[in-house]
Amino acid sequence: MNKPQRNPEIVWRVEKRRQAEVLKALEAGEDVDDSGTVILLLSGMMHQLNLVGGLIWQQCDGQKTQADIAGELAKEFSVEQVEVETDVAEFISDLTERGWLSNG
């Protein structure tokens, strides 16, 4: 079973204030930009993940399957799990190809 695990060489942090602002804006029905809510540092480069990418990243602990992660995301955004499964799989696949995740 595929349980994505973050690359331990990547230093990362959650921009909690920014994440809270974006979640509040979404709840109010406002459009949100793709501002980073999670910052990754790798090989001297800084990368930002938007809200959804950041929420997925935070759950890639080697304990949860892709389906578990999709389920959590579906709950967070009050949608059916099937609506997010493909996006979660594609995002995890992309980060795995970059070497940022592995299959735990």
Language-model region placement:
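Acidic, low-complexity/disordered tracts enriched in E/D and polar residues
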Residues: 1-54
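Long, charge-rich, low-complexity alpha-helical segments
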Residues: 42-104
